[in-house]
Amino acid sequence: MSWRADILTLFPNMFPGPLGFSLAGRALERGIWSCEAHDLRQHGLGRHRAVDDTPFGGGAGMVMRADVLDTALSALPALDGRPVVYPTPRGRRISHEDAERLSSGPGVVVLCGRFEGVDERVLEKHDIEQLCMGDVVLSGGEIPALTLLDACVRLLPGVMGSDVSGQDESFADGLLEYPQYTKPAVWDGRDVPDILLSGNHGAIARWRHEQSIAVTKARRPDLWDAYLARQQVH
C-alpha cells in the first residue's frame, strides 16, 4: 500500500503542484505515494459555501468554522492511523525527526488554514497536530503543506537514488550539512579544498564532519546545543 496524503484546502489546484516534479513527481507516478486534495468549499454553508465567520470576542479577520472543518474531516476515507496535521505559526517547529516519523507511517492528512486560522474546538476534537515551518507568517497553509509533504516523501523507500544521500543531509545526524563542491576544480579564482581531491576517504569524512560542526555552531547554535546534549546522553 502506498503512502497516502490527503489535503483539506480552499485551493485544491495547488496540489500536487511542485510535488509533481523531480523526486516526488517520479515517486507519485510509480505509486510510491498518492496525493488527493479536497476542496473545503464543498462543505461550506449556504449559497456562497461559506467556510468562515467573524471571531467571537472581536478582532480583525475571519476564522474557519469548526462545523465545516469537522464535516470535511469526517468525509475523508478511513484515516487508518494517519495523523492530521495543521500547519500554523502557533505550532511546534517541525524537525527532521517529525518528517521521519510521519514518513514511516501510512500517510498524513494536512488541514490548510486561511484567514486568521481555525476554530480551536475542531483542533481539540480531532487531536490535530500543530506544526510550524518557521518563525514567519504566510497567507495560508498550502505552502507549508507542500513543504511538509516533500520532506516526508523524499524519505520513503525507493524515492531517493541512494540511501546514503539521506544519511549525509542536514539534520540527519543532528548537524547541518557540510559544504559541497563539483567541477570545475578551479572557478573564478576559487579552488576546491585539496582534501576533497586527495582520494583519502577517511580524511574526507573527518573534514566533512568538522565542517558540519563549524557550520552548525555558526548558523544554528540551538541545533549545536541539542547535538551536544545527545552526545552526553550516549
Curated annotation (Swiss-Prot):
GO terms for cellular component: cytosol. The keyword Methyltransferase applies. Its main location: cytoplasm. Keywords: Cytoplasm, Methyltransferase, S-adenosyl-L-methionine, Transferase, tRNA processing. It is found in: Cytoplasm. One of its GO terms (biological process) is tRNA N1-guanine methylation. S-adenosyl-L-methionine binds at residue 113. Homodimer. PANTHER family: TRNA (GUANINE-N(1)-)-METHYLTRANSFERASE. Specifically methylates guanosine-37 in various tRNAs. Belongs to the RNA methyltransferase TrmD family. This is tRNA (guanine-N(1)-)-methyltransferase.
